[in-house]
Structures are given as C-alpha cells and as structure tokens.
Amino acid sequence: MSELKELWAVKSFRARIFLAILPTSIALVVGHFATDRQRPYDFHAEESFVIPPKGREGQEMTINWRVTHHRTCPGTVERQLVDPNTGVIVAAYDPAPADTNGGQDGWLRKTFRVPRDIQAGNIAYQSKLTYQCNWLQKFVPALAIRYLTPRIVFTVEK
C-alpha cells in the first residue's frame, strides 16, 4: 500500500493517469453519439394510403403514413414523386423541415400538389429523410440519420 502512495505522489504518474482517462472518456462519448442510429419514425407502407387514391394534375392530395414514433429530432424532408417501375424521379419538391409534432397518434399526414405537367398513370410518393438527433450529427453531416420512406403508389388521371 505504501508503494502505491509513493507512486501516486509522483507527478508524472498522475499526469499519465489523467492523460489516459480524458481521451478515453472523450472517445466513449463521441463513439456513443456517432453510433446513434435510431430512426425517429418507422413507416408502415401496408397501412399507409393516399387520399384521394386517384388524382389529377394540379390537385392537392394527402399522404397518410402509418408510423411508429421513436423520438423527436430536427431534420429535413425531400419529397419526391417517382415512377414505381423504374425509380426515375418524376417530380421533386423543395426540401422542408421535418415534422417534429406529428406521429404521436400513429399517423403522419402530408399534403402535396400533383404537378401540372405530370403524365397519367401510376406514380409513387416517397421521401428522403435526414435527421440530426444529437450534437455530433449536427456538426458532422455525414453522420446524420438518412433513409427513404417506402413508396406509396397512387394514380394520376388526365
């Protein structure tokens, strides 16, 4: 025991202990935030739908997403209309802030306008989501949580 007290009395030993604990603690905190991948929402395509199921050019439609809400985080949503067969983007809407108030009742509802120059036929709605759920994801955008919603198909009529 006296050897330990003598060792602790040496300044260089205390400095080495401090220099070992500090970087390890920082690495643990940064590692925890870097591996934080829990999505704010899980989207259930089989229970989701578009109202009305058939629309026309210029018409407003509402997508009703059945979701499981896990957490609330700031982020952005890039909504897209795509060809359900090829995945080609037919229309892209301006990025918008992610909804931080929705999903508590199990539903997210988003209204969009069908573009005037869109072709008739089946079209799929999807969103590219980007969330920053902690400070590291805000400062290092490559670590942000990114994912696509499932595609919900509806019909555009002339």
Where are these regions (language model features)?
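Hydrophobic membrane-insertion alpha-helices, especially the h-region
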Residues: 11-35
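Extracellular/lumen-exposed scaffold segments
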Residues: 18, 33, 44, 93-98, ...
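A glycine-anchored, Pro-Gly-centered beta-turn/N-cap motif
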Residues: 104-106, 119-125
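N-terminal Lys/Arg-rich, disordered targeting/topogenic segments
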Residues: 1-10
